[in-house]
Each structure stands twice: as structure tokens, then as C-alpha cells.
Amino acid sequence: MYNYVEQGLITIKNYDLPEKLKRNTKLHHVRKNKKKLGRSIEERPKEIDQRNEFGHWECDLVLGHKTKDDQVLLTLSERMSREFLIIKIPDKTAASVMNAFKNLRKQYSEHWNDIFKTITTDNGSEFADLANLEEVSKTLVYYAHPYTSCDKGTVERHNGLIRRFIPKGDCINNYSLQQIIDIETWCNSLPRKILAYHTPDEIFERELDKIYQTA
């Protein structure tokens, strides 16, 4: 009967019939396993999952228009305080990512090892060189399971906050550095129920004070 309808031999439409099966003729591509870049999240101490210790971060990128000349946002979230850092970088290359971390290390100088104890990120090629931090500091870098965003759910959720201001598809180039700073400030000034209605900034500054006082 469906064939008769398609050929116009019966004056009813497909949507008049109870159900018409559709066959998906698209080719299905099997994902290839990504190359393991370094230490797996499987090796990360389980205590980090409890969020009781300061200094454990998750790292990601937020893309805009996805063109070669569009800038991207490097994002980092500290797991205990939920402090969120947004760094505008020229592109999604490993070199640009590492340059951003180089500047971040200069900012926190001798306190870096206490503030950035671990970093968990994904297996994207843009983070291929991140494990090199272990050669110049005590920071340990862990790589999430491939295609498993929940391994770094904190930074993923914060990336969602960015989308309130920068919708998917918008060019990052169109947003000034001050606008990016304003977004970061808004995120870190937002009281959180999980933080007993403190803000990430309040918790982060409290932990920094502890580090600076004992240095």
C-alpha cells in the first residue's frame, strides 16, 4: 500500500497511514580511539572526587564561530571553590594553550604548586602539551576518558554559563577582553547553594589567604 501511495495510485497521503517506516540511509562512522596523551584520570587519587582539598582544576576550551581566524576561550574551574577562569587565546593550538598556562604560572609565581596541584582535561590535541607542566612544576595532569565530558563536569557546567552571554556560533572575536572579564566576574560572584551560599570568589580568596600566610 505504501508503494501505491508513493506512486500516486491511491489518493491518500503518507501521513494518513498509521505508520511509515523510515530507513536511515546515512553512513555511520565508527569513532576511532583517541591517542592517549598522558596520565589517565583512572590514576587520579579518589580523594579529589570529594572536593575537600583546594587546588584541583578542570580545563576545557569554548569555541565560537569555529573558523581558523576566530579566537577561543580557555576555561579552568577549581573543583572545591568553583572558581572559574576564562582566558582569551588566539586559537585552539597546543602552543596557544601552553602560552596561556605560561602566563598563568607567572601570575601565581612561587605559589603555583599549591594553587594548581592537579589539572584534569580531555584528550584533544590542543591539550597534547599540557603534561609538560609536570616537567617545570609539581602539577599533575590527568586526561579524561575519550568522549566522556562528565569526567570534567565542573568546567563543562561553567562553560554553560558562558553561553548565556556568548551563544553557540557567535564569533569570540566580537567580544572584547573587558566583556570576557565581566562574564568571569559574574560567574565568580554568583552565590552557590552547594557553597552554603558563598560565592566562588569568597572561597577562592579564603584558600589563597591560607596559602600566602603559610608561605
Predicted regions and their residues:
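Active-site beta-loop-alpha junctions of metal-dependent nucleic acid enzymes
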Residues: 65, 69, 86-110
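Mobile genetic element proteins and their domesticated derivatives, centered on retroelements
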Residues: 1, 60, 82, 101, ...
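Short, conserved beta-strand edge motifs with alternating hydrophobic and charged residues
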Residues: 75-77, 85-88, 118-122
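Acidic/histidine-rich, metal-coordinating catalytic segments
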Residues: 113-129
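Short, surface-exposed connector motifs at secondary-structure boundaries
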Residues: 81-85, 110-116, 165-166
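An active-site-proximal beta-strand-loop segment
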Residues: 43-84
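Charged alpha-helix within mobile-element recombinases
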Residues: 134-141, 145-215
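Basic, flexible linker segments flanking DNA-binding modules
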Residues: 2-50
